[in-house]
Amino acid sequence: MTLKRNGNDAPLRIVRLDKELPLPRRAHPTDAGIDLYTAQDVTIAPGCRELVGTGIAIALPVGTVGLVHPRSGLALKKGLSIVNAPGTIDADYRGEIKVCLINLDPEEPIELARGERIAQLLVQEVSLCDVEEVNSVEELGVTVRGESGYGSTGV
């Protein structure tokens, strides 16, 4: 199958810091997320969080950002999520990718085995715009929404 790609076609360069772990990959060719694996066995007590290494370092293409999202199956079946979902990986970061996991189950600990899929990485284009200060809200421009914020479109 030939996939049509949009925008930046530069590859995601990955180094496995732990060669025994699988290379991160998509479960299906058209999946947005690339599965990330835990580099160690870990037990997360109810309501607790744990910073878990994935055993990889990456070089994202310039003009992209890596967003680390929870896996929906683990969220549903075990109550596992990511504290700062989505986690943000900047294109110039070269350290090990780590995921701050949290056990949202109020009673049961979550046991994760080394090599288990724990999160998914999405690579998205990002606008690297400059910051320009203006002197008043009026200089930001008028919109239909204006200052209507939280709950303004209904519950």
Curated annotation (Swiss-Prot):
What keywords is this UniProt entry annotated with?
Hydrolase, Magnesium, Metal-binding, Nucleotide metabolism
Question: Is Coiled coil one of the keywords UniProt gives this record?
Answer: no
CC cofactor: Mg(2+)
Pfam families tied to this protein: dUTPase
Instruction: Name the enzyme group at the top EC level.
Output: hydrolase
Q: Does the keyword Membrane apply?
A: no
Q: Which GO terms describe its molecular function?
A: dUTP diphosphatase activity; magnesium ion binding
Q: In which pathway does it act?
A: Pyrimidine metabolism; dUMP biosynthesis; dUMP from dCTP (dUTP route): step 2/2
Superkingdom of the organism of origin: Bacteria
Q: Which residues bind substrate?
A: 71-73, 84, 88-90, 98
Per the UniProt entry, what is one GO biological process? dUTP catabolic process
Leader sequence segment: none
InterPro entries registered for this protein in UniProt: dUTPase, dUTPase-like, dUTPase-like_sf, dUTPase_trimeric
Q: What is its EC number?
A: 3.6.1.23
Catalysed reaction, written as an equation: dUTP + H2O = dUMP + diphosphate + H(+)
Q: Which family does it belong to?
A: Belongs to the dUTPase family.
The UniProt entry, under NCBIfam families, shows: dut, PRK00601.1
* Function per UniProt: This enzyme is involved in nucleotide metabolism: it produces dUMP, the immediate precursor of thymidine nucleotides and it decreases the intracellular concentration of dUTP so that uracil cannot be incorporated into DNA.
Q: What is this protein called?
A: Deoxyuridine 5'-triphosphate nucleotidohydrolase
